[in-house]
């Protein structure tokens, strides 16, 4: 997405919010999406990027949705916005074996980032949460890092992504087996080598020896009980539970307004990070 501009004074930060919406080919009764993004209260530029669109792929309608939460710059997140879905769909077996195609594309995309000699890709990194909806029926969700995917079914929240926390036993063991370590300093979150607060990312060349970009992948069959999908950056999940986000979104049939209200609630709860939310409503 384009960078979101902001004006600053000595006493106040004024940020611009970006929102939009769209729908699948089924029109009024079909699947609709909306998104809302707003820059956080930090001094750096907006580092969250997103994808939200429907496209035709070999006669199938695909909904492509993603949030990429960058750190140490927005370059890796911007690269993912441009390349990750295209790399997934380049695989000739995508419709036959989506899980394998997604996992392979995540790995290959990260390798291309790490091999790139551009200086703007040297130091930064990004989380990713992606969702691919095939013909309105099959939903494939993948993630690395701590951006979340939440499905509401009959008003109940179910997290469909995994937060890759360095202090998780499995993640810590992986890091330590590669020669890294996890710090637990008072007043701070666990960090890889004292630096990074997630254990799986794209990029981060200086820490890659201790990390990986292997995604968690889950599939969901959309049925009459499936209400909507929320994709959210950690600017939301740090201050709201999954059920709280669902409770806000389910009050609004318009997915753009639902996304805006989730963002507004995160701001109300004093979230300081960049905040991004996509809502895909199935019924």
UniProtKB/Swiss-Prot annotation:
EC assignment: 3.1.3.16
One Gene Ontology cellular component annotation held by this UniProt entry: plasma membrane
Domain of life (superkingdom): Eukaryota
Residues engaged in binding Mn(2+) 2: 69, 234, 273
Recorded GO MF terms: metal ion binding; protein serine/threonine phosphatase activity
Class of the enzyme per the UniProt entry, highest EC level: hydrolase
Entry keyword annotation includes NAD: no
Catalysed reaction equations from the record: O-phospho-L-seryl-[protein] + H2O = L-seryl-[protein] + phosphate; O-phospho-L-threonyl-[protein] + H2O = L-threonyl-[protein] + phosphate
Residue ranges of every copy of the PPM-type phosphatase domain listed in the record: 32-282
Protein name: Probable protein phosphatase 2C 17
Provenance organism: Arabidopsis thaliana
């Amino acid at each position: 997405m384009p960078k979101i501009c902001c004006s600053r004074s000595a006493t106040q930060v004024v940020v611009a919010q970006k929102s939009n919406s769209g729908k699948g080919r089924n029109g009024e009764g079909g699947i609709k999406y909306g998104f809302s993004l707003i820059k956080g209260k930090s001094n750096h530029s907006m580092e969250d990027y997103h994808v939200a669109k429907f496209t035709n792929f070999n006669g199938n309608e695909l909904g492509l949705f993603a949030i990429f939460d960058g750190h140490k710059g927005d370059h890796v997140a911007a690269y993912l916005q441009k390349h990750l879905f295209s790399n997934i769909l380049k695989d000739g077996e995508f419709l036959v074996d989506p899980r394998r195609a997604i996992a392979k594309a995540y790995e290959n995309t990260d390798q291309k980032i790490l091999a790139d000699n551009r200086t703007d890709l040297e130091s930064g990194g990004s989380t990713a949460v992606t969702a691919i909806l095939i013909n309105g029926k099959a939903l494939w969700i993948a993630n690395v890092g701590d951006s979340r995917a939440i499905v509401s079914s009959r008003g109940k929240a179910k997290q469909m992504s995994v937060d890759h926390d360095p202090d998780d036993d499995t993640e810590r063991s992986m890091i330590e087996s590669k020669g890294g370590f996890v710090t637990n300093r008072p007043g701070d979150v666990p960090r890889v080598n004292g630096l990074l607060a997630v254990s799986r990312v794209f990029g981060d060349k200086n820490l890659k020896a201790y990390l990986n970009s292997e995604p968690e992948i889950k599939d969901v069959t959309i049925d009459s009980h499936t209400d909507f999908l929320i994709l959210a950056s950690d600017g939301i999940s740090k201050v709201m539970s999954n059920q709280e986000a669902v409770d806000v979104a389910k009050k609004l049939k318009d997915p753009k307004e639902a996304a805006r209200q989730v963002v507004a609630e995160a701001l109300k709860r004093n979230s300081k990070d960049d905040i991004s939310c996509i809502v895909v409503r199935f019924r």
